[in-house]
């Protein structure tokens, strides 16, 4: 059974890895992923400087999923550059900035560490969709800003890596979209640029879960509002993957899709691939189950594929039937 996949020149021995979020901030957590059945190691979304994040409690989960308002706690971008050599698997740095200038500075430093110092950085995932930064909106919901950000990002990326053979793959992490014309607009914007992949979806922002016993919110920041994940968001995640798959297909753009949101079982993984995902990330389930989640979900996916007489994911990827 072949579960391997690729994004551009970067090959993965399976189709399942961690999502940038839980348990990927510190070196020991990254090494734990490196020694697991995750096909890659993706860092916590990093900023220019180290951040403590939002006040606690800032994470809560139940049987249906999770809510968080972490606020991007991370070790600062130099930390993830420094320890890249400790990781054997494909290593993808997730990054962002609180302004375009900060984002470009972080991106430039990451790329220069690759070109000038041969650091092991295999990919860059630019997070334009964190819903949990107080008083900061999500860039990917402002389409004019999204276009401008991608223009600047791709200019720096292309110029600094112009003579470099195996470039780090470049992708963006998107929020969930809900309107068909939003998929059209964002699909058109992204298709203009040399983007290798998109990750969709990030958590659904400004959700609220209630502790009925105490008649209170379950997390502290933002009046209890946070990003919703887990099973709650799977239908939205599937829809976003499917819509962007169709958008890129009609534009003849080979932009790969990383599906994320509510993947708990092999059946969930199969559904995402059927909708058009090339690679899958797990966040909430990884937080709950730790690294054993990768082996179990991959085993279950293999069983679903065997039952349906599929030998590799290419045989059913994107082939969702409509009725």
What residues fall within each predicted segment?
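Glycine-rich phosphate-binding active-site loops on the catalytic face of alpha/beta enzymes
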Residues: 43-48, 123-124, 128-130, 197-207, ...
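C-terminal helical cap(s) of enzyme catalytic domains, especially alpha/beta-barrels
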Residues: 51-64, 208-226, 285-311
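Short beta-strand/loop segments at the ligand-binding rim of alpha/beta enzyme cores
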Residues: 10-17, 88-92, 159-178, 246-260
């Amino acid at each position: 059974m072949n579960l391997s996949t690729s994004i551009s020149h970067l090959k993965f021995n399976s189709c399942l890895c961690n999502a940038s979020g839980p348990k990927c901030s510190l070196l020991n957590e990254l090494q734990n992923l490196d020694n697991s059945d995750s096909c890659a190691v993706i860092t916590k979304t990093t900023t220019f400087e180290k951040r403590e994040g939002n006040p606690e409690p800032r994470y809560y989960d139940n049987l249906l999923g999770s809510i968080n308002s972490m606020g991007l706690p991370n070790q600062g971008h130099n930390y993830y550059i420094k320890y890249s050599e400790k990781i054997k698997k494909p290593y993808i740095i997730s990054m962002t900035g609180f302004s375009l200038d900060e984002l470009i500075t972080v991106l430039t430093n990451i790329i220069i560490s690759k070109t000038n110092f041969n650091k092991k950085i295999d990919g860059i995932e630019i997070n334009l969709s964190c819903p949990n930064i107080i008083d900061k909106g999500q860039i990917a919901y402002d389409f004019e800003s999204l276009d401008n950000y991608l223009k600047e990002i791709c200019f720096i990326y292309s110029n600094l890596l112009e003579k470099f053979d195996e470039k780090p793959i470049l992708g963006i992490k998107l929020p969930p979209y809900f309107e068909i014309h939003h998929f059209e607009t964002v699909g058109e914007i992204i298709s203009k640029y040399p983007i290798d992949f998109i990750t969709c979806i990030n958590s659904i922002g400004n959700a609220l879960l209630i502790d009925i016993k105490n008649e209170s919110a379950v997390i502290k920041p933002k009046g209890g509002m946070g990003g919703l994940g887990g099973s709650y968001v799977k239908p939205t995640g599937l829809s976003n993957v499917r819509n962007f798959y169709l958008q890129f297909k009609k534009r003849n753009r080979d932009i790969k899709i990383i599906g994320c949101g509510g993947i708990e079982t092999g059946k969930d993984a199969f559904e995402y691939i059927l909708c058009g995902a090339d690679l899958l990330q797990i966040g909430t389930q990884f937080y709950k189950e730790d690294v054993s989640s990768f082996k179990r979900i991959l085993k279950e996916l293999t069983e679903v594929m065997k039952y349906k007489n599929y030998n590799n994911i290419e045989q059913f990827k994107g082939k969702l039937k409509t009725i």
